[in-house]
């Protein structure tokens, strides 16, 4: 069995004392990492966006220090608050618009960059939608998990305003596919 832990929206800044909606973001992230370290044994950790709130290099250094302390494979998806260039400076890699990550012989994680520069809401571009269709076909014998920062299903409150803008296109690709197990 594969165990994946998902962490989302740490909203770290260069200031460890930043509070957002009465939450000290660094302190909260540190407690989450500590809890995982003491209580869980994941095979893989997925951080699904808004790693930083200010996009600063310092925030990504804080993140790197904590996430790497778990000594587990991890993958980071960027969100609307993240800065791709500063993230790349710290992690020395590009964040592809679509990436397929084999988790085992039977499971594949497909991560999508749904960020749109200068926008809070997200979208998938046509090239991504084509790649998604191909990945579903190529991996028809495997279980697929899709992960993106912007949610494709309406939740019924303010967050819907910044969800996936072309959710209908994305959902039409995945809804009737038996090998798509989770989003």
Give the label of every model feature segment.
Residues 2-14, 107-116, 145-149:
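Active-site-proximal beta-strand elements of phosphoester/diester hydrolases
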Residues 5-27, 84-94, 117-126:
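Acidic/histidine-rich helix-loop elements
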Residues 9, 45, 50, 63, ...:
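Divalent metal-coordination and catalytic microenvironments
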Residues 16-18, 47-68, 83-96, 122, ...:
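Metal-dependent catalytic neighborhoods of phosphoester/phosphodiester hydrolases
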Residues 18, 142-182:
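Active-site-proximal segments of metal-dependent phosphoesterases and phosphodiesterases across multiple
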Residues 41-43, 72, 141-143, 179:
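Short coil/turn segments at beta-strand junctions that form active-site/ligand-binding loops
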Residues 74-84, 181:
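A short, structured active-site edge motif that brings together acidic residues
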């Amino acid at each position: 069995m594969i165990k994946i832990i998902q962490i989302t929206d740490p909203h770290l800044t260069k200031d460890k004392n930043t509070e957002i909606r009465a939450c000290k973001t660094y302190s909260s992230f540190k407690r989450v990492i500590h809890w995982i370290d003491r209580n869980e044994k994941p095979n893989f950790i997925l951080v699904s966006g808004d790693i930083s709130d200010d996009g600063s290099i310092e925030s990504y250094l804080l993140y790197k220090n904590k996430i790497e302390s778990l000594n587990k494979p991890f993958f980071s998806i960027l969100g609307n608050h993240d800065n791709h260039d500063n993230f790349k400076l710290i992690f020395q890699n590009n964040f592809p618009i679509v990436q397929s990550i084999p988790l085992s012989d039977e499971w594949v994680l497909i991560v999508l960059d749904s960020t749109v520069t200068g926008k809070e809401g997200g979208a998938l571009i046509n090239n991504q939608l084509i790649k998604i269709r191909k990945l579903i076909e190529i991996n028809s014998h495997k279980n697929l998990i899709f992960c993106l920062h912007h949610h494709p299903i309406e939740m019924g409150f303010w967050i819907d305003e910044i969800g996936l803008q072309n959710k209908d296109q994305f959902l039409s690709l995945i809804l009737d596919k038996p090998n798509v197990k989770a989003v």
